[in-house]
Swiss-Prot record:
<feature type="compositionally biased region" description="Basic and acidic residues">
    <location>
        <begin position="267"/>
        <end position="282"/>
    </location>
</feature>
<dbReference type="GO" id="GO:0000122">
    <property type="term" value="P:negative regulation of transcription by RNA polymerase II"/>
</dbReference>
<feature type="zinc finger region" description="NF-X1-type 1">
    <location>
        <begin position="460"/>
        <end position="478"/>
    </location>
</feature>
<feature type="compositionally biased region" description="Low complexity">
    <location>
        <begin position="903"/>
        <end position="921"/>
    </location>
</feature>
<dbReference type="InterPro" id="IPR034078">
    <property type="entry name" value="NFX1_fam"/>
</dbReference>
<dbReference type="Pfam" id="PF01422">
    <property type="entry name" value="zf-NF-X1"/>
</dbReference>
<keyword id="KW-0238">DNA-binding</keyword>
<feature type="region of interest" description="Disordered">
    <location>
        <begin position="1"/>
        <end position="123"/>
    </location>
</feature>
<feature type="compositionally biased region" description="Acidic residues">
    <location>
        <begin position="925"/>
        <end position="934"/>
    </location>
</feature>
<feature type="zinc finger region" description="NF-X1-type 4">
    <location>
        <begin position="642"/>
        <end position="661"/>
    </location>
</feature>
<keyword id="KW-0805">Transcription regulation</keyword>
<feature type="zinc finger region" description="NF-X1-type 6">
    <location>
        <begin position="796"/>
        <end position="817"/>
    </location>
</feature>
<keyword id="KW-0539">Nucleus</keyword>
<keyword id="KW-0479">Metal-binding</keyword>
<feature type="compositionally biased region" description="Pro residues">
    <location>
        <begin position="240"/>
        <end position="252"/>
    </location>
</feature>
<comment type="function">
    <text>May play a role in transcription regulation.</text>
</comment>
<feature type="region of interest" description="Disordered">
    <location>
        <begin position="142"/>
        <end position="164"/>
    </location>
</feature>
């Protein structure tokens, strides 16, 4: 009320002048029409803007006035002149509400509440500035004309007065939120406007007739309006107040009116110029604007209005119209933005307004069914997110998602609601009306009443004044209390309920700092001010130190000192100021105030040091503080520092010592208890350990990382409590991060390490630079994969590759261009070698002379020195000695490395055509005999390839003869060399004489001649002895040097020189310059036999004179008697077909026929049946599955015989390769195992079902054959019975027969042999899953246990071989899930192929030699029947050829005698022929066990056991 009464008189004058301005009437109709026509060119475009501006003026009357503002009723009308008429009057009542921002609305509140100045303002067309008009500018004539015009307008368009109309919810909503779309009701004639003033204290509703502003051509863009800055109207000069004129003045003459108009035009032009100048000043001096002036709303400038104003200035008749159009422009009203696409969007529009808009447009969707929510639909709104759903949809949603606790989550905000679905009750938005019905005059789903809810999450006490609405209530529009900024210089005001976060103004804080001397120079800020940063010089209390960097106001001043010397801080040192006694100094720390008086003054000391005896009792008088204090004889008894014990010493001077009383104390970890001195305990407690003592127990509790132990002695922490943090691991983790470059720098922790935080801000490109990873690039990122071809040029220069490889990191793949290169050993040029191949080997033997000068390198063509690579050899463990490439001993190898002598680079290719030697070739030291030795070695090596024993004997004899001849030659050469040396010595005698007497004079020339004639030096004996002694020492040094050099020149291979003690060679490492050791016995294995050669034992070699021989047992004697019996009855006529017969050409022991072969010729005769030596190098029985081969041979006898015939014909032929085609894996298994049995090489071609066979150097036809072995062993599995009258016993590989001459027994023997020919039936389980094991098949055939054997051919095929047909027939009818069939022995499943075709089977030639079998004889039916065991036995029985063994044994004994004689002459032992495979059970197991043993390790010597 007080503010409303204190309205300044200027405001009242302005209100009266407003009415007078609006009553101006122009009499010049022609001028009015012309001006209006020019000004209405954009009439249609600006119609909406003018209407909105008019409505904005109307809306300004709905201002909230906190203080009662009394507005007078004004009735103003405006005239508009269309282009086609002269003068027309319109009265529009549209209430289109403009869209203004909250700041403008807030400014309107501020202007109405505090300014209370309703001034009549007029907008200038030039500058869009607000111009204030006073009554002095209006003449009396203009007032009279305006009065007439006002009366005419009142008669034509006087608005009817109607009662006050209440606001609906749309108008109320717009009133609270001007951003929303305005509600425009349809006009019905002339409708008055309701100007409602909502006052917080008193609401005064007055009816006002709001004037209409004329249509103004304002085509200014919307964006420019927003960017225009408001300008202060402070340059407007106040006009002198004129007396109030009546509302209807009297008309005056026309001449006076025109002069008044001209004066008005001049005044307006002057004011406009002042306005433009003030506008520029305001723009340039924005920083000097006062805060109070910045609160006023200033109109924006319009450039289009400026241009139009310039045209109107030239026309004086348009002044009145422009003044009338701008008369109702209220000062301080900013322009609103009416285009919804500019700033009116969902980000700035409240949720409630968005929901109202969607509901009215019927486009609001349910989040459950995605259908539009109809106006008649039953809805449910979430109380948290205010989302609307169909009631049926939300019930279905909640019923499906409800938990056991009865909670379910909202689909929009996931809030847990506890209301059960069946308790849903539809209600309006405010909750007042249950299940509201649709009313077209109200918002759908609302009750149409005022909301009245308090705003959530706000302290506002006012309730919502909007009508029932969806979404959250809008913020309260009431203003709150006035508050100050942080520094208190600026005041601000917030809306009601708005959170106050404080305000920072642009001024300085200027609060007094803590020092009390300076003020804060920072900008207005929150919190306390920072300490004063000004430093000053201060002195300590004792005066020793002066600090010039002390902060201002720090410290405490010492008031005891004088003002001229202020002191502020303590230096923490001893005071040392002189006390009042003048003798002592203060011992306290630098302190504030005066020092205490001296404590040794006689007045203050009246007792001894222990305070138990007075000085009078002691009879001592002290006169000065320097006099000593006397000591009594009592115990001190002063309480010590431990506060528990007293001093036990006598009264003494000075402080008491530490307490020496022992007390029971516990260590820091609490595990040890000891008695220690109390004083020591006190010192330990005051130290960093904070314990009485520490024990030596080491804590083994894991630290926080769970990897390291604590390791602290006497740790006070436990596994459960660690208040001191002793178990926090302080080690650095140090693990490699994922990037692979950096390590984890965190403290040791459990779990995974973090990712590497280092990034690269450079582009990571591929090597060619065409693929790039943009930064930042995490550490450890690999270069990108590039699909472009590699651009790196090779060093070799080749670029025409078969395929171009992609861009890559790292080196390029090896070059595949084919070039010609010299082999690594320098033997020949290799063609079509890859360019990237460094060492191309030609495959030949190296043949370079080694460093020992006795061997050549046996390695395949290689690069680098010819040394043995012993990197992978364990020197500590004795390695088995091999015939080639053996490892040198450790000492020799170290000597070789220390010497570092270069190896000889001579490329002496002395290798012969037999390059498959088993040891490096020996080179004799005598150069003259090298060629002879090479020839002898060639012959010897070629002769060794023959299989006849006679040839071996001859070759050995030749070798012995050659060696003897070489020795003789060496001896002769040595003798000749010795003679030559003696001759040289005799010749040297004359030279000595010449040199010794070279210095003699001419007088003694005759004596010199005489001395020259003598052959000896007779005068210089002493000098000669000295020279000889020196030469002898030099020779010894040279010999030692030579021995050391020769010791370092060892090649590391076997020596290989034949030993003198036996027929074996030296197996020591190469030892150049040293003879083979004779004190070491030969370690080679030999086999000794009994007299009849039936028994044999393997033992160590004992030299050439080995006379050890086994004794024959009873079996030998029995067989000897049988031989003699056969010889007595039948003689030797059956020895022609015996393979052991000396007269038989197939006899390997035949000494009468010898066949010598060279390296350039091949044997055309078939290879004889030989017996493999188990001690040979090529013998590898561990790779042969002999038991499985014998087992499958019982099921496939026909197939075995066909394979044997194929292999034997291949061995007897000149072919180097044989190709066989097979059908399934069983044939492949048989072919591979038989190839191992015959010791042949093979190569599989599984995709083509081919297998190729090649001959080895050790290929032989085994004896007995596999079919014979199966026939002999087959008696154990057959169901038939064999007569005991004819039995074959196999002992150590040789068969002997004990028979009777009964014909019936012979027939039984033949029948038994025929029964052995029958194959064992078998079942083939095929296509088995890899998970099927032997146990599965064993469980299937468990009822036939002991009557079958299983043999896995491969991972998916298995054979079950049965011993009788009954069990087989029962097993073949068993039902199982496995796939099986009866195995068929079909020889036609394998065929021989030559090239890509399979040969047909030719018949054997009738004229073929009986000694040589036909290559394809195994395919002849006649030959096949003859090859059977039954046929051979029957033929022998018919001819009584079974007695030929007697003659055979007899001839063998004769041959052995001859061999023994030859051995005695040549000192060479011939190995007897021993069969490889034995068919008896005991011997077979022994042979299998022996085959699995390593031949290089301990060998059992059975000689001592026998």
């Amino acid at each position: 009320m007080e503010e409303s009464q204190n309205i300044p008189p200027k405001t009242q004058t302005l209100n009266n002048s407003e009415n007078s301005i609006n009553n101006i009437n122009n009499n010049n109709l022609t001028t009015t029409t012309t001006t209006t026509a020019v000004g209405n060119t954009n009439y249609k475009n600006n119609n909406r803007y003018n209407n909105n501006r008019y409505n904005r003026n109307n809306f300004n009357n709905y201002n909230n006035n906190n203080n009662n503002n009394n507005n007078n009723n004004n009735m103003v009308t405006s005239t508009t002149s269309p282009p086609t008429t002269t003068t027309t009057t319109t009265s529009t009542t549209t209430t289109a509400t403009p869209s203004s921002n909250s700041n403008n609305r807030r400014k309107n509140y501020h202007n109405n509440n505090y300014n209370n100045n309703n001034n009549n303002n007029q907008l200038s067309e030039d500058t869009d500035e607000v111009i204030l008009y006073t009554p002095a500018d209006i003449s009396a004539s203009l007032k009279s004309e305006s009065a007439k015009q006002q009366q005419q307008q009142q008669q034509q368009s006087l608005p009817t007065q109607e009662p006050t109309q209440t606001l609906n919810w749309q108008q109320e909503l717009y009133k609270l939120n001007p951003k929303s779309k305005a509600f425009v009701p349809k006009p019905q004639g002339s409708v008055p406007f309701n100007n409602t003033n909502n006052n917080n204290n008193n609401n005064n509703n007055n009816n006002n007739n709001v004037p209409q502003s004329p249509i103004k051509d304002n085509n200014r863009p919307q964006r420019e309006r927003r960017e225009r800055k408001p300008k202060e109207n402070n340059t407007q000069q106040p006009q002198p107040q004129q007396p109030q004129q009546p509302q209807q003045p009297q008309p005056q003459p026309q001449q006076q009116q025109q002069s008044q108009q001209q004066q008005t035009v001049k005044e307006n032009n002057r004011k406009k110029e002042n306005k433009l100048q003030s506008k520029k000043d305001i723009i340039t001096n924005n920083d000097n604007i006062e805060p109070i002036k910045s609160k006023e709303d200033i109109s924006l400038a319009n450039k289009f209005a400026k241009n139009r104003a310039k045209e109107n200035l030239a026309k004086t008749n348009s002044i009145n119209n422009s003044n009338t159009a701008n008369s109702n422009k209220i000062k301080g009203k900013t322009k609103f933005i009416f285009n919804e696409n500019d700033e009116k969007n969902s980000e700035y529009t409240p949720l409630a307004i968005q929901m109202i808009t969607k509901i009215q447009a019927n486009i609001y969707e349910c989040m459950v069914c995605f259908e539009n929510v109809g106006k008649n639909a039953v809805i449910w709104s979430c109380s948290q997110c205010f989302t609307m759903f169909h009631s049926s949809c939300i019930k279905q949603w909640s019923s499906k998602s409800v938990t056991t606790e009865g909670k379910w989550k909202c689909p929009g905000c996931r809030y847990n609601h506890e209301v059960k679905p069946e308790h849903f009750q539809p209600a309006c938005f405010c909750g007042k009306v249950k299940d509201p019905q649709y009313n077209p005059y109200h918002l759908a789903h609302s009750c149409g009443e005022v909301c009245g809810k308090l705003r959530a999450k706000s302290n506002c006490p006012h309730s919502c004044t909007m009508l029932c609405h969806p979404g959250p209530c809008l913020n309260c529009s009431s203003l709150g209390d006035i508050k100050d900024c942080y520094c208190g210089k600026t005041k601000y005001r917030l809306l009601c309920g708005e959170v106050d976060k404080g305000k920072v103004c642009e001024g300085k804080c200027e609060k007094l700092l803590s020092c009390g001397n300076h003020r804060c120079q920072q900008q207005c800020h929150s919190g306390s001010c920072s300490p004063c940063e000004v430093v000053e010089t201060q002195k300590c209390y004792c005066g020793k130190h002066i600090d010039k960097t002390k902060p201002c106001g720090s410290g405490s001043i010492d008031t005891s000192q004088s003002d001229d010397d202020p002191r502020f801080f303590s230096c923490a040192e001893k005071c040392d100021r002189t006390l009042d006694c003048g003798n002592h100094k203060c011992q306290r720390t630098c302190h504030k105030g005066d020092c205490e008086p001296c404590s040794l003054v006689p007045d203050r000391v009246d007792r001894c040091n222990c305070k138990q005896t007075t000085l009078e009792e002691l009879g001592v008088v002290r006169t000065s503080c320097l006099d000593p204090i006397p000591v009594c004889k009592k115990v001190c008894s002063t309480l010590l520092a431990c506060k528990q014990h007293s001093c036990t010493d006598r009264c003494h001077t000075g402080p008491c010592g530490s307490c020496k009383v022992k007390v029971r104390s516990i260590c820091r970890c609490g595990k040890t208890t000891e008695n220690r001195q109390c004083g020591v305990i006190q010192q330990n407690m005051s130290s960093t350990s904070a314990a009485a003592f520490t024990c030596g127990n080491v804590c083994k509790i894991l630290r926080s990382c769970k990897r390291h132990e604590c390791g602290v002695k006497c740790c006070p922490s436990t596994s459960s409590s660690d208040e001191a943090g002793n178990h926090v691991c302080t080690l650095v983790c140090g693990k490699q991060l994922k990037c692979g470059v950096h390590k984890c720098q965190q403290l040791c922790h459990s779990g995974k390490c973090y990712n590497c935080y280092i990034n690269s801000y450079d582009d990571l490109a591929c090597p060619c630079g065409k693929t790039v990873i943009q930064p930042p690039v995490p550490c450890g990122t690999k270069p990108p994969m590039c699909n472009h071809p590699c651009t790196i040029k090779r060093e070799c220069g080749h670029s025409n590759e078969v395929w171009e490889h992609k861009c890559h990191s790292g080196p390029c793949p090896p070059c595949t261009y084919l070039v010609d290169k010299m082999c690594a050993g320098g033997h020949q040029v290799q063609k079509s070698v890859k360019c990237s191949t460094i060492d191309a080997s030609c495959g030949r033997i190296c043949g370079k002379v080694l460093s020992c000068l006795s061997h050549t390198c046996p390695r395949i063509c290689h690069s680098g020195p010819c040394l043995i690579n012993n990197n992978n050899v364990n020197i500590n463990k004795q390695q088995p000695l091999l015939p080639a490439n053996l490892i040198a001993s450790k000492n020799n190898y170290q000597l070789q490395q220390q010497s570092k002598l270069p190896t000889t680079t001579t490329t002496t290719t002395t290798t012969t055509s037999t390059t498959s030697t088993t040891s490096p070739k020996i080179i004799e030291k005598d150069e003259e005999l090298i060629e002879d030795d090479n020839n002898n070695n060639n012959n010897n090596n070629n002769n060794n390839n023959n299989n006849n024993n006679n040839n071996n004997n001859n070759n050995n004899n030749n070798n012995n003869n050659n060696n003897n001849n070489n020795n003789n030659n060496n001896n002769n050469n040595n003798n000749n060399n010795n003679n030559n040396e003696k001759a040289e010595i005799t010749n040297e005698c004359n030279h000595d004489h010449d040199h010794e007497h070279e210095h003699s004079d001419d007088e003694n020339s005759e004596e010199e001649v005489d001395l020259n004639e003598c052959n000896h030096n007779h005068e210089c004996n002493e000098e000669e002895e000295r020279i000889k002694k020196e030469e002898k020492e030099d020779d010894e040094d040279e010999d030692e040097l030579f021995d050391s050099l020769m010791g370092n020149l060892t090649c590391g291979y076997l020596c290989g020189i034949p030993l003198k003690s036996c027929e074996h060679t030296c197996h020591q490492a190469c030892h150049p310059g040293e003879p083979c050791p004779t004190n070491i016995s030969c370690k080679q294995k030999v086999r000794i036999y009994c007299k009849c050669k039936r028994r044999s034992v393997e033992t160590l070699c004992c030299g050439k004179d080995d006379t050890r021989q086994l004794e024959c047992d009873e079996v030998c004697e029995k067989e000897e008697r049988e031989k003699q019996l056969k010889e007595a009855f039948y003689g030797s006529h059956t020895l022609d077909n015996n393979p052991n017969n000396p007269n038989n050409p197939n006899n390997p022991n035949n000494n009468t026929t010898t066949t010598t072969t060279t390296t350039t010729t091949t044997t055309s005769s078939p290879t004889n049946f030989t017996v493999l030596d188990p001690t040979s190098i090529d013998y590898q029985p561990n790779k042969l599955q002999i038991e499985a081969l014998q087992l499958i041979a019982k099921a496939s006898p026909k197939l075995i015989k066909k394979i044997e015939a194929i292999y034997e014909d291949f061995i007897n032929s000149n072919l180097l390769k044989q190709t066989i085609k097979y059908t399934d894996s069983i044939q492949l298994f048989l072919l591979v195992q038989m190839a191992k049995f015959y010791q042949m090489k093979y190569r599989e071609k599984k995709p083509l079902n081919y297998i190729e066979f090649f001959k080895k150097t050790s290929y032989q036809i085994p004896s007995p054959r596999l079919s014979e072995m199966v026939g002999i062993n087959g008696s154990s599995l057959s169901s038939g019975t064999i007569s005991n009258s004819l039995s074959f016993s196999i002992n150590n590989g040789q068969s002997y027969a004990s028979i009777s001459l009964s014909p019936s027994e012979m027939v039984a023997q033949a029948q038994a042999q025929a029964e052995l020919e029958n194959q064992c039936p078998a079942l083939l389980f095929k296509n088995l899953d890899p998970s099927i094991k032997t146990d599965h098949l064993t469980n299937l055939l468990q009822e036939f246990e002991g009557r079958y054997k299983l043999m896995w051919v491969d991972d998916s095929n298995c054979l079950a071989i049965f011993g009788d047909s009954i069990s087989f027939s029962m097993a073949s009818q068993i039902k199982t899930m496995f796939t099986y069939e009866i195995y068929q022995d079909d020889p036609s499943l394998i065929d021989i192929t030559f090239g890509n075709s399979v040969l047909s089977t030719p018949t054997s030639s009738s004229g073929s030699n009986s000694g040589v079998s036909s290559p394809l004889s195994y395919l002849s039916p006649l030959k096949k029947s003859q090859d059977t065991q039954f046929f051979r036995v029957s033929q022998q029985m018919n001819k009584f050829s079974f007695l030929d063994t007697i003659n055979q044994n007899q001839n063998q004994n004769n041959n052995n005698n001859n061999n023994n004689n030859n051995n005695n002459n040549s000192n060479i032992n011939i190995k007897p022929t021993i069969p490889l495979y034995s068919t008896s059970t005991a011997n077979a197991n022994r042979m299998l066990r022996r085959s699995n043993e390593n031949t290089g390790e301990n060998v059992a010597d059975d000689w001592e056991n026998l």
